[in-house]
Regions:
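Short linear motifs embedded in intrinsically disordered, proline/glycine-rich low-complexity segments
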Residues: 1-191
Length: 191
């Protein structure tokens, strides 16, 4: 196993001791392949978090060595994560894998995600229709503080799904209050 990959797994092993995560991966192209539709991450691990599935990407950070394209040694490289309520499902749904991959593609092409950044995607493909998800807010993963990794500082950004009404509230200036409420309440960090 490679140093960066092992490091990400170790971060989550602290949260889920003894678990072997499920892994989902799309066919990938080499990182220098800039064609549209190319997978931006090498896969997504899924952990059983009790009442939720906890997804984390693998590949936005340097997994094998420090690439020329990565941020400098003082920057923070981040993987994306998402906690999705189980909704009585015995197996984790795949729509979060696709959603995280889509957002990872934007990040790998230069989009910036940081604490309290929200964005509208339109209806999220595959998500339960009754959830009404149309976007997300980015938070620093509360359970995993950024720390030195093998190729620089590594953090995890938690994406929390938002409804159209929540996104409208944010657009109308209610972002600080809503995002603070989500950040302060682990139950509201489930999508």
């Amino acid at each position: 196993m490679h140093a960066g990959w092992t490091f990400i797994e170790a971060l989550f092993a602290d949260l889920y001791p003894g678990q072997t995560p499920k892994h989902a991966a799309a066919a990938i192209a080499p990182q220098h392949d800039l064609r549209l539709g190319r997978a931006s991450v090498e896969g997504t691990h899924v952990y059983d978090a009790g009442n939720a599935w906890h997804y984390v990407t693998l590949g936005l950070t340097d997994l094998y060595d420090q690439s020329d394209a990565s941020v400098g040694p003082n920057g923070i490289r981040c993987e994306l994560s998402m906690r999705v309520a189980k909704r009585d499902s015995a197996e984790p749904p795949l729509w979060p894998v696709a959603f995280l991959g889509k957002i990872a593609a934007h990040v790998s092409q230069g989009s910036v995600l940081a604490q309290a950044v929200s964005f509208r995607t339109g209806p999220i493909a595959g998500a339960p229709a009754d959830a009404g998800l149309e976007g997300a807010v980015a938070l620093l993963e509360p359970a995993i503080a950024p720390r030195p990794g093998p190729f620089g500082k590594v953090g995890v950004i938690l994406l929390v799904g938002l409804t159209g009404l929540q996104l409208d509230e944010i657009k109308q200036g209610g972002s600080a209050k809503l995002i603070a409420e989500i950040a302060a309440d682990p139950a509201r960090q489930l999508t």
